[in-house]
Amino acid sequence: MQKYIVEARSLLALAIPVVIAQLSQTAMGVVDTIMAGSVSATDMAAVAVGTSIWLPAILFGHGLLLALTPTVAQLNGSGRRNQIAHQVRQGFWLAFCVSVLIMVVIYNSDHIIMRMHNIDPVLADKAVGFLHAIMWGAPGYLFFQVLRNQCEGLSKTKPGMVIGFIGLLVNIPINYIFIYGKFGAPALGGVGCGVATGTVYWVMFLMMRWYVTRARSQQDIKLEKGFAAPDWQVMKRLGGLGLPVALALFFEVTLFAVVALLVSPLGIVAVAGHQIALNFSSLMFMLPMSLSVAATIRVGFRLGQGSVDDARVAAYTSIAVGLMLACVTAIFTVVFREHIALLYNKTPEVVVMASHLMLLAALYQLSDAIQVIGSGVLRGYKDTRSIFFITFTAYWLLGLPSGYLLGLTDYIVPAMGPSGFWIGFVIGLTSAAILMALRIRWLQKQPSAFILQKAAH
């Protein structure tokens, strides 16, 4: 039992800074929305529309680079720190290639926005302007993620927390300058949010670059030592590990986006209640997501040390801690659901709808914790292809179809509206949790030589 307690402490020490870093990123989006909304409702809506296109694109790149964390953790655990710099340099090349692809997609996103049904032309122009501004921050964001993944692979999660918080503080005055046109800058409104956020991503990268070159714990990792040409074999391996994770993230983000579109014809009350419940559950999701990052680090590090048993302890401990936290957040959600809904909106009908959906949100928090932490464990084992197949099956073949049938049709029961889609979320996330758990169990039953060879690949 003692080893599980020690492992739990290590996991929480890694996870807490990740939570704070994620909150900083979320708060940056909230600040953009509030400050754009102070100009006009059109500017706020333009930021929302632009973000709905930007987020899946940049998260795809983010997911692709997550392969670096277990790679660095495994090299660190096995005492091969001299190989880390080369992996990170190739991570930069991969980030550069992906950022170019993302910028091309975002630059041409005006075709998507202009074809949206009944979209206001002014709103469309502002949304396109927002995207054309923020896309220049794509390389900065992904370069920052490369160095953040290096630090996290070395069990250093605090730098990402500190720099994320500084990024939030920097974002506010830059927003102020470009949204309202201060100090000689043009008043860009919602487009200014894109300029500010893109700038902040580069600032965060430069701060992280400054940290890794001066941190005593990383003096032996010489990133700046000469020019490193692309190593296509390493890039292919990193891309092969990261692509399933990137696609899994893309499936998850687009699932919620599609459900939002399907709910939109059901009326203002349904849409508002759905959005409130989804926003709050997304905040609660940050806790197990941070444990997922910690699980990847700990499992990868233990496998690097050649200890399959310790990796198993790290995996089970992370899931157990996640379940305990999920029980707390689920109880909190059930008890205070009406009070939480009132913080968002005072309309009685909306509060009733949101409160009802939060009951379902509380129900799926347990399975959500298992599936997201399970995904982190599998990343630690470098078993990322299974993550892709599990998420695709659970979300798109089980969750979304069942939600659609329950929410909008009378085939099974009378159409349930938003509640039907949330039951679909429960089905999808529970299916993912079961499949993740089964995959982890299967993997841990394999011979130690097989597990270690897979992790060392």
UniProtKB/Swiss-Prot annotation:
GO terms for cellular component: plasma membrane. It is found in: Cell inner membrane. It is a multi-pass membrane protein. One of its GO terms (molecular function) is xenobiotic transmembrane transporter activity. The keyword Transport applies. Disulfide bonds: none annotated. Keywords: Antiport, Cell inner membrane, Cell membrane, Ion transport, Membrane, Sodium, Sodium transport, Transmembrane, Transmembrane helix, Transport. It holds the Pfam family MatE. CDD domains: MATE_NorM_like. HAMAP family: MdtK. Multidrug efflux pump that functions probably as a Na(+)/drug antiporter. This is Multidrug resistance protein MdtK. It comes from Yersinia enterocolitica serotype O:8 / biotype 1B (strain NCTC 13174 / 8081). The gene is mdtK.
